[in-house]
């Protein structure tokens, strides 16, 4: 009996060590991965132009492009010169909360402030009158999904259909330097 108890004790200790080792190794393999980018381009940017822009950057892996991607968010924007901002705001740009998209804050690109605007705003005569006085036009964002995903059942194979966070940060920074690119949003794979 004592031989059997000794074997069971050794086997139990071995199993505990295997489990502890497995838990210690698991977190080190969980690297943040990015499988696509949602990119917002300037009004009028065409899919061939998007392809030409992306070809100038090391995107790390092969990718597909969908420039009809519906982000489910804002669609319209206005571009206001920084120097004209005080006059446009004073004239009433921010008067009505329903004009600028509160869920999407304004951002700066070069010498301009980009304001996402609501669908309601582009039909509001008061809003349009302010834009007319300052020679500002409503524009439409061009959204493109740049995806590394392939048709395999595994979507998280680093170096095949997703990239590292470090590469994604580099690509984001490089693309946002392009005058036609407004925003680059990496799509993270969550665990």
Swiss-Prot record:
Cross-referenced Pfam families: UPF0228
Domain of life from the UniProt record: Archaea
Xref: InterPro entries: UPF0228
Similarity remark: Belongs to the UPF0228 family.
Record-given protein name: UPF0228 protein MM_1428
């Amino acid at each position: 009996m004592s031989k059997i108890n000794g074997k069971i004790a050794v086997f139990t200790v071995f199993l505990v060590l295997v489990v502890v080792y497995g838990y210690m190794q698991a977190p080190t393999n969980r690297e943040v991965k990015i499988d696509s980018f949602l990119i917002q381009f300037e009004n009028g940017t065409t899919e061939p132009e998007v392809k030409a822009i992306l070809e100038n950057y090391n995107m790390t892996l092969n990718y597909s492009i969908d420039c009809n991607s519906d982000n489910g968010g804002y669609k319209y924007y206005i571009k206001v010169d920084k120097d004209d901002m005080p006059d446009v705001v004073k004239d009433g740009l921010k008067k009505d909360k329903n004009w600028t998209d509160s869920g999407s804050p304004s951002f700066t690109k070069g010498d301009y402030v980009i304001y996402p605007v609501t669908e309601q705003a582009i039909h509001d005569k008061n809003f349009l009158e302010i834009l007319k006085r300052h020679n500002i036009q409503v524009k439409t964002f061009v959204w493109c999904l740049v995806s590394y995903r392939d048709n395999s059942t595994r979507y998280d194979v680093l170096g095949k259909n997703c990239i590292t966070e470090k590469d994604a940060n580099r690509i984001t920074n490089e693309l946002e330097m392009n005058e036609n690119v407004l925003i680059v949003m990496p799509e993270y794979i969550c665990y």
